[in-house]
Amino acid sequence: MDYPKMDYFLDVESAHRLLDVESAQRFFYSQGAQARRATLLLPPTLMAASSEDDIDRRPIRRVRSKSDTPYLAEARISFNLGAAEEVERLAAMRSDSLVPGTHTPPIRRRSKFANLGRIFKPWKWRKKKSEKFKHTSAALERKISMRQSREELIKRGVLKEIYDKDGELSISNEEDSLENGQSLSSSQLSLPALSEMEPVPMPRDPCSYEVLQPSDIMDGPDPGAPVKLPCLPVKLSPPLPPKKVMICMPVGGPDLSLVSYTAQKSGQQGVAQHHHTVLPSQIQHQLQYGSHGQHLPSTTGSLPMHPSGCRMIDELNKTLAMTMQRLESSEQRVPCSTSYHSSGLHSGDGVTKAGPMGLPEIRQVPTVVIECDDNKENVPHESDYEDSSCLYTREEEEEEEDEDDDSSLYTSSLAMKVCRKDSLAIKLSNRPSKRELEEKNILPRQTDEERLELRQQIGTKLTRRLSQRPTAEELEQRNILKPRNEQEEQEEKREIKRRLTRKLSQRPTVEELRERKILIRFSDYVEVADAQDYDRRADKPWTRLTAADKAAIRKELNEFKSTEMEVHELSRHLTRFHRP
């Protein structure tokens, strides 16, 4: 017997293999008319088995019409599943009716947060972070390995280069940083041929002028040490380290270059001295005259200047000329006795020495490192006075005289206290003079002639304004100023006097006022009686009342209520004390 082939039915072999007769019947009953029509096309063995069984009396639930083809496709798909229970459950879930049958399992509803796992996946975040960290660290390592040298950065223009003659001078930029991240802040001046030489370290103190001595005229044991100029506690150092200006004046000519290195770390000294700003006039004075009074050849006038350093030296000369006279006066006012180091400047011309290993002859020139104090107003006066070298020299002298430690400590602490308390005098001594204010263009610089001209201009302005004021006649014409004679004024005064005397003569006496019950003073309103003085706060008169007193008060109050107080007729029944 040939069975018709229909694409929406399963083949018979798979139906035999997957289902027994009962489950197939159950499924086809649940699928409606189209599924029931499929039972006619089953093989005879299947039909016989189904006729022998009892007929299923369950009500048939019809869900869709005959034209609904997708359900046939769903039936075909569901036959491929493993068990008939799965088929039945799927059919119940596909149906629009949510009421489960007697044999259908309950519908499994999906959770509210079923879709949350698609969007929100926090278990992957840690992995992403660690991967990101690995990527960034790898990129940083790659950048560090690809870092360029100083010469390449100078070629690219990242670092500035001041001049290149025999030696190269280059100022390190902010971008040229150390390996640990700290940026180089000091200016560096280096020779490629003399890279092995030890640089001369300068103290870290930001407020000291230092003169580097010529290497050939040193007689002391410390040939490379800088000579510290004596200090004056007049200009106090700003709290932050200011900008440095290097004055380099090579002696031999343009082919000789200066080797100096400015390091930030100072040597470990016994006493950490903060030097005050050395005055520029003192620098000139100390360059010309040594510590022992011996005359040195003047360096600023005779030395030829390097072409690239001309601008800096011009600026320095301007500042020297600007502050010369004021600083000389302050020098006379506050003398300070300080001593040079053991290695002093000696007289004599600078002689060039041949360097080691056949290097070209190099002459060390006196180099002045000057700090530009841009912020003179924000000055910690007391702390600088505490650390001034004058106090330290006094303490050293006391120690040399072998005085008691306690007494020296007491005197030094007393001196510190006096210096601290004298801050007003320090501030007054640090006030800038008129000339300095004029030089800073804070006060306008004026000669006597300019001052006189300004006064004359102000005078002419005032006279012109006074001449523009209206005269008395104009004011009279405008009816602002009324014309008056002396006789008229006298008459007005007499009239006022007459009126006042008439009023005073017509004033009633106190008795008349009392008769009219017009009282003047407060005592006229109040009856005065003598009373005993007692503590009114502590006194509680109701505690002294007896039961009879209380009853009398109550009776009086009730009578007053019943007779004097008016009560509305509608609320009279609410009162206890109404008239009978």
Curated annotation (Swiss-Prot):
Location of the protein in the cell: Cytoplasm; Synapse; Nucleus
Induction, as annotated: Up-regulated by VEGFA.
Annotated stretches, region: Disordered: 331-355, 376-410, 462-494
GO CC term (a single one): synapse
Tissue: Detected in umbilical vein endothelial cells.
Pfam families: RPEL
Composition skew (Basic and acidic residues), residue ranges: 471-494
Residue stretches of biased makeup (Acidic residues): 395-407
Top-level taxonomic group: Eukaryota
Phosphoprotein in keyword set: yes
Residues the record lists as Phosphoserine modifications: S67, S78, S467, S505
Consequence of substituting N479I: In DEE70; severely impaired interaction with actin
Record-level GO BP terms: actin cytoskeleton organization; actomyosin structure organization; cell motility; cerebral cortex development; dendrite arborization; regulation of neuron migration; stress fiber assembly
Cross-referenced Gene3D superfamilies: 6.10.140.1750, 6.10.140.2130
Family the entry assigns: Belongs to the phosphatase and actin regulator family.
Subunit field text: Interacts (via RPEL repeats) with ACTA1 and PPP1CA; ACTA1 and PPP1CA compete for the same binding site.
Name by which UniProt lists this protein: Phosphatase and actin regulator 1
